[in-house]
Design a protein with these regions (language model features):
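Solvent-exposed alpha-helical segments and adjacent loops
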Residues: 1-175
């Protein structure tokens, strides 16, 4: 008998976008903890409902057993995949493992000093030292979907649906 194992490296935003995974692993979303702001805006609620509706359309079941909180401190001891709406809770911002590329409307890109392809063969400080730093700002709406491994459980994922304004939330719901 031949058994096949199926593995996927998480977090993978493609499988989230296409199938709602890892949240859709349990069709009723019983392994999901949604973290929302204390006073969510209409756009944040629309983003949440759009995300849950999309996952439900993949599983064929409504999200009847998910947990929801507006207290970011409650996520530390939960054995659940986290879905963050609106902003990253401060309890996650302090984690050194999380490399967030989006902070409000700014992000940065590093370009190494080394300009040839041998960095993987002969790694040195030039391969890691930035030659330039580019700040990216926007006066228009911004939205981001980011994913990372949960800092509380290496078998769990976090997906954050972030927007800086009501128009940013529209970008998320129309994506």
């Amino acid at each position: 008998t031949l058994f096949r194992s199926h593995f996927i490296a998480l977090p993978d935003l493609r499988v989230f976008a296409n199938a709602g995974f890892p949240y859709s692993r349990m069709a009723d979303l019983s392994d999901t903890l949604v973290v929302v702001p204390k006073a969510p805006t209409q756009g944040q609620v629309a983003t949440l409902l759009q995300a849950l509706g999309g996952i439900g359309s993949q599983t064929g079941l409504a999200a009847i057993n998910l947990q929801m909180t507006d207290d970011g401190n409650q996520i530390k001891n939960k054995d659940a995949d986290l879905l963050l709406i609106g902003a990253i809770p401060s309890s996650l911002k302090d984690d050194t493992k999380i490399n967030l590329l989006v902070e409000a409307t700014k992000s940065w890109v590093k370009m190494p000093m080394r300009h040839y392809d041998l960095a993987s063969i002969y790694p040195d400080d030039d391969a890691r030292t930035p030659n330039t730093r580019t700040d990216i700002t926007s006066s228009g709406p911004m939205a981001a979907v980011i994913g990372f491994q949960s800092p509380y459980n290496d078998q769990r994922s976090v997906v954050a649906l972030l927007a800086d304004s009501p128009r940013g939330n529209e970008l998320l719901t129309n994506a």
